[in-house]
Design a protein with these regions (language model features):
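Multi-pass alpha-helical transporter architecture, strongest
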Residues: 152-174
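A membrane-interface helix-boundary motif in multi-pass transporters
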Residues: 136-157
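Helical-face signature of the major facilitator-like transporter fold
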Residues: 1, 5, 79-91
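Intracellular juxtamembrane helix-capping segments at the cytosolic ends
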Residues: 96-109
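A late C-terminal transmembrane helix in Major Facilitator Superfamily
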Residues: 108-143
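Helix-to-loop junctions at the C-terminal end of transmembrane segments
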Residues: 43-56, 140
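Extracytoplasmic gate region of multi-pass secondary transporters
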Residues: 1-34
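Structural signature of the two symmetry-related core transmembrane helices
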Residues: 58-73
């Protein structure tokens, strides 16, 4: 949960600055694009069960790969296409990734431990929200003002999230 939310929280924390800094998309559109990403996240959550049915064991890498694609589009394609497609990928990754992590944690912990697992997931979520900007600030202090540094940082976190997700054992077939 920490890696997922770290990858996600870098988007709303830096999207307006990054996008307006490019000068292609006007500031009047930024809030609408971010709201659209939230709407896409809703659909990601609603479609999670269907995605899980189609991807089966591949579900564990779905969200990390979408974060990677989303931040790659934001960083290297840019413009309207990269911004809209990247935002949609990041929103969908967040929307589908959270129910995956919750269901996986509940499955592994068992029914009796669910009351302790959910607070721990919430703690990881809030810790990521707190630490992501602080880690980015520390990175900026080390390397200086690099264009799209927040997106590069998010790409690194998404790679870590992908590697961590690959460690999740496949579910037994029913």
């Amino acid at each position: 949960m920490f890696l997922l939310m770290s990858a996600f929280f870098l988007y709303p924390a830096n999207f307006a600055l990054e996008t307006s800094g490019d000068g292609v998309i006007g500031q009047q559109y930024i809030a609408a694009i971010m709201a659209g990403a939230d709407l896409v996240a809703l659909f990601g959550g609603l479609l999670f069960v269907r995605i899980q049915g189609v991807l089966r064991g591949g579900t564990k890498v779905f969200a990390p790969l979408l974060f990677l694609v989303g931040y790659l589009l934001l960083t290297f394609l840019g413009g309207w296409a990269g911004t809209l497609l990247g935002s949609a990928c990041i929103g969908f990754a967040n929307g589908a990734g959270i129910p995956f992590l919750i269901s996986e944690a509940a499955r592994r912990a068992g029914k009796d431990a669910t009351t302790t697992v959910m607070p721990l997931l919430s703690a990881a979520l809030y810790l990521a929200q707190l630490l992501s900007p602080l880690l980015l600030r520390a990175l900026t202090a080390m390397v200086g003002d690099v264009p799209h540094l927040s997106y590069y940082f998010a790409l690194a976190i998404a790679c870590l999230f992908l590697l961590w997700s690959l460690r999740i054992p496949a579910r037994a077939r029913r």
